[in-house]
């Protein structure tokens, strides 16, 4: 399955690939091989980047689900966070270009905060990117829990898609957007949450339980 967020880009990649294939027929053998190989690479890379496999969200109460595919690169405690007006735990997930980049809702509830912030394009694995890069901020309040998370663009990723806005009712595990071509998601929640992941662990959006409360 290909995400609707990538259909325009996929169409552009298809056109470029067709042009390259057409050129390969009139070029010398070695040049033809290079150009046709490039056409195949562009098409295959675009297809794999915008893939959007179905996910089975655990049917379990009081869980927080990973909003992103990737690798946990940071877990830390913060003394204060504006959204919570108190201490929080933070988990940062780095998404490489080979990961699925569609993001999913971590808890069911109501969206109470949304903000788009323009910024820099530091490497997404640089922890300073969470405060300095282009990003969106989303806050969700559920029945017994609230979370705050950021979609953060990276050095390559320069297009954030986020479909939720304040007042929206959202469901755990459902798609809400994506970040194109390498990026990061930071998620924050109260310190009372029991962590279920560790640094270096891989996560799957919509499936991996990162916390329980």
From Swiss-Prot:
Is synthesized initially as an inactive proenzyme. Formation of the active enzyme involves a self-maturation process in which the active site pyruvoyl group is generated from an internal serine residue via an autocatalytic post-translational modification. Two non-identical subunits are generated from the proenzyme in this reaction, and the pyruvate is formed at the N-terminus of the alpha chain, which is derived from the carboxyl end of the proenzyme. Pathway: Phospholipid metabolism; phosphatidylethanolamine biosynthesis; phosphatidylethanolamine from CDP-diacylglycerol: step 2/2. It comes from the Bacteria. The record marks 182-183 as: Cleavage (non-hydrolytic). Keywords: Cell membrane, Decarboxylase, Lipid biosynthesis, Lipid metabolism, Lyase, Membrane, Phospholipid biosynthesis, Phospholipid metabolism, Pyruvate, Zymogen. GO terms for cellular component: plasma membrane. It is found in: Cell membrane. Its cofactor is pyruvate. Its EC number is 4.1.1.65. It is a peripheral membrane protein. Signal peptide: none annotated. Pfam families: PS_Dcarbxylase. It catalyses: a 1,2-diacyl-sn-glycero-3-phospho-L-serine + H(+) = a 1,2-diacyl-sn-glycero-3-phosphoethanolamine + CO2. The active site is at 183 (schiff-base intermediate with substrate). The keyword Membrane applies. Binds 1 pyruvoyl group covalently per subunit. Its main location: membrane. Disulfide bonds: none annotated. HAMAP family: PS_decarb_PSD_A. Catalyzes the formation of phosphatidylethanolamine (PtdEtn) from phosphatidylserine (PtdSer). NCBIfam families: PRK05305.1-2, PRK05305.2-2, PRK05305.2-5. This is Phosphatidylserine decarboxylase proenzyme. It comes from Chloroherpeton thalassium (strain ATCC 35110 / GB-78).
């Amino acid at each position: 399955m290909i995400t609707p967020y990538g259909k325009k880009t996929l169409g552009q990649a298809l056109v470029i690939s067709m042009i390259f294939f057409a050129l390969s027929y009139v070029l010398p053998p070695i040049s033809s091989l290079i150009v046709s190989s490039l056409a195949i690479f562009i098409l295959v890379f675009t297809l794999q980047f915008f893939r959007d496999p179905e996910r089975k969200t655990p049917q379990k109460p009081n869980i927080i689900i990973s909003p992103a595919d990737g690798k946990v690169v940071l877990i830390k405690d913060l003394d204060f966070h504006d959204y919570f007006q108190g201490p929080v735990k933070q988990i940062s997930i780095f998404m490489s270009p080979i990961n699925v980049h569609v993001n999913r809702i971590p808890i069911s509830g109501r969206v109470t905060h949304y903000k788009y912030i323009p910024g820099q394009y530091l490497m997404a694995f640089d922890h300073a990117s969470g405060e300095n890069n282009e990003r969106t901020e989303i806050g969700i309040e559920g029945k017994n829990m609230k979370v705050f998370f950021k979609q953060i663009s990276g050095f390559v990723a320069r297009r954030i898609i986020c479909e939720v806005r304040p007042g929206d009712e959202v469901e755990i595990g459902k798609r809400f957007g994506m970040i194109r071509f390498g990026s990061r998601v930071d998620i924050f929640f109260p310190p009372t949450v029991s962590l279920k992941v560790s640094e270096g662990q891989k996560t799957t959006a919509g499936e991996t339980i990162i916390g329980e409360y």
